Every structure is written in structure tokens, then in C-alpha cells.
């Protein structure tokens, strides 16, 4: 269910700044706050406990239970479509310490794509302090991303090892739980008690994509 609300009084002011619109999408995350890899909801929190029949609905505002936190949800998709309908030029600003899936910027097949999207800015944590200077032309950024951005995180090799493992699968075993205060059966006292496995070593991000063909062949 989308929570997009239209305001006719606000819409009447659009003509005063019709040259371009900016849409800001925010994500939080960091050490001790891994981004959820599922939008399964038990009515109170994100969960993987399907066996108990708890995760039987998507997070409020999500498109699907199979989506993840770094995708645009239904609210954001509807908002972006609405703004693109009202403005001929739209720039998306990403206020996030984590890279989001941004295929909607240039992929016509993406569910959130629109022809009126003309650009995107990634301002990360403190970038908001200089974003206005970039927008008005006082500062000229490099125009390049600082890493390789995946179009589909579920196809990224680190997907199976990263985060709090709130996705069902063969990897969701006892070995993925760090038992520093385990119960008698070897599990943590909390099902969220997981840890990140960096099996890729230093070959994260662009290092993986730039070296995979050399170390493993083109296939």
C-alpha cells in the first residue's frame, strides 16, 4: 500500500520552480546496523521466521517480501513516478552511506525508470553540506562513482555471506551464528545473532569485478 498523498495547494506552486525537481531517498546503515536483505514482516519487525507463520506480509510500504532494503520501495516508486509526471527534469539525490540499486537512473526495463530522470547524486553521510553548491554550479564534482555499483545485489557474490542472514537458504545454518554466548544447542540466544563472513577477502567491490576474469576466466 502506497502512502503517497497529493496536495492540490502544493501542486499549485510547482510552476514557480518548474525548471527541475529533486527527489531525495535516504537509507541508514553501518556497523551494528546491517541493511536487511528481505522485506518480510511479522507485524512488528523484519523477520525470517516463516516456519512459525510470522513473516506473512511485506514491510509496510514495500513492493514485495522478496525485495531488500537498498531497493526503492512502493512509496518511493510512486513518489518518483508522481514527480516525473509533474516535472520535465528530475534529479535523484541518494542520502545513504550504502550504495543503493539505482538501475532506475538509466534502465528502461527497471520498475522505477522514467524518461524525465536526468541525473543522480550520491551525497552519502556528510555530502548534504555541499550538495547545494553542486546544484547551483558553485562546485564541479568529478561526476564519477567511487566504486562499481551492482544493478542487482542478489547476483553479487557477497550476497550469500553478508548481513544478518534474514533470507532463507542453505547458508542459514548453525555455522553462520557466532556462538560467544550460545544456548545449549549451539545457537545464539537471539536469532539476530549473526556475523559477516568476508570470504572474498580483499576482493570486495571493484576489486572483485576487475580481477575475476583474470583469476577465474571469463566464464
Residue ranges of each PLM-predicted region?
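C-terminal non-catalytic regions of proteins with extracellular/luminal or membrane-system context
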Residues: 1-219
